[in-house]
Amino acid sequence: MKKNVVLLGCSNLLGMHHAFRQVFQHTQSDAYETETYLEDDYAKYTNLAVAGGGNALIKWRLFDFLEHEIPDYVYLQFSGLVRRDFYFDKESIENFELEPTTSKKHLYIPGGNHVHEKNAKSFIHRLQNASYNFYDDNTNNWHSLQDIFSAVTVLDKLKIKHNWSIYYDPINPPTENTKMEGIIAKWPAFIDHSNKLSSPLNYAIDSGVDVPDGVHFDYDTFLKYLENNKSKIHLNFDDK
């Protein structure tokens, strides 16, 4: 039976299902693929990463997927703690000027790094303005940590093999831009770290990789990151 692998994150995880396939299957052979889906003779990969997505969106998309399907392995790459996402019933899509991410039932508005909109006119901009404190980059951290807890805990409860990380280390943010993504002094005791991996962005910078925008690492760096953490990742094709 094919391995069912699911990835969830923000823009730093877009396209990175190819890196998982390259590291764990040692192949770049032909496969059926779309922007978010890849399938070969041994595995199918679903990449639910969304540019600008925060940790609530990652949690919601995970729960949406688990409602219909139980994968063999999940990798969660959490995003900036400060990001505030929103979801609405899918039937209300006509009320939005932008094109949101959708699931079978919901549409999602990614939090991203929201900039205060002066004289905001659209519903979304007014909602975002009301949801961020522009004098405190840590205003949404506590809610975001609860989202991480919920996502990790449901995978534990369902006994789904998984790993998780945050794209940057919120205790030691490596760049000025990640300092604005939310900083914490320590992790709350209620989050289980047994399947946690180190930050790929911190890995990139510690390895001497140039990260021009202080946020996004490239494919080759993530490939090396997976190889470096391979022994800790609970994805195994030895039985294939």
Show the residue positions of the predicted features.
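Alpha-helical cap/lid subdomain in secreted, periplasmic
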Residues: 2, 63-240
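Serine-esterase "nucleophile elbow" of acetyl-processing enzymes
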Residues: 1-57, 61-68, 218, 223
